[in-house]
Amino acid sequence: MSRFEMNQIKGVIPAMMTFFDREENVDTECTRRMVEFMLEHGADGFYLTGSTGECFTMTVEERNLVVDTVIDQVKGRMPVVVHVGDIGTKKSIELAEHAYRAGADAISSVPPFYWKFRAGDIYNYYRDISESTPLPMVVYNIQLAGLMDMDLLLQLAGLPNVHGLKYTARSHDEMGFIKETLGPDFMIYSGCDEMAFSGMCSGADGIIGSFYNLFPDLYKQILKKVEESDIKGGMRLQRIADEVIFAALKYDFPSVLHNLMNWRGLE
């Protein structure tokens, strides 16, 4: 079973990049070094093999290696959420079962994509994956995979193992409504790095994002401003983060993120 309960998975959670060597193999040494860097700079957990982790360009073996390496390095100090989404349900279940055996604290998945799926198909996908392990499931709502509407999200929240939502969209009014409707035991994570402050003010329990690889400590300060009800201070810090984000997003993602990590001397 997981070491952390869902209500303990909160705060600043980097959607961890996957680090490769020059031969395009997973660089486990760099991965371990990055885990320590992020923990030292305020990370409250890790979200593995998601969009930022380039999961859809990786083999099952590569994804599992990242999971094994990070969980071994973390050694139970912080919660680890593993994204197991894939274009096929069977492969997603295989990834979920591995995450459970490896010691992950929760699993997550984007909805099925490429073809146009009906709400019932998406519901069945999440049902099958969430039932494949005892781990809590975090539904991942993101434009790239096709945003799910509120009715479907509320339906998915009724599945026994679904206990959270990663909401990567700018309509924070909807996110806040979902949190208010489902109550404090259902965890909401804001997924827009450029709107982390807004997300937390709208009721999110934590933030999961790409740029927290670079400066988790800055986002830790943003969350502190939310706790202190310091609106001006929080907005000021968010603007600092946004300057980097908006400049970076003029270039190809996620390669620009790797270049920024190199620029900081981290990768």
What are these regions (language model features)?
Residues 250-255, 261:
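C-terminal substrate-binding/catalytic lobe of Rossmann-fold NAD(P)-dependent oxidoreductases
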Residues 2-14, 19-147:
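Active-site beta->alpha loop and helix N-cap motifs at the rims of alpha/beta catalytic domains
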Residues 253, 266-267:
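Interdomain hinge/lid region at the active-site interface
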Residues 128-132, 143-251:
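Catalytic alpha/beta core domains of metabolic enzymes, predominantly
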Residues 260-266:
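An extracytoplasmic/periplasmic, membrane-proximal ligand-sensing/linker region
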Residues 77-78, 136, 163, 185, ...:
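Secondary-structure boundary/capping positions in well-ordered alpha/beta enzyme cores
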Residues 71, 242-246, 258:
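Structural signal for well-ordered, non-membrane alpha-helices
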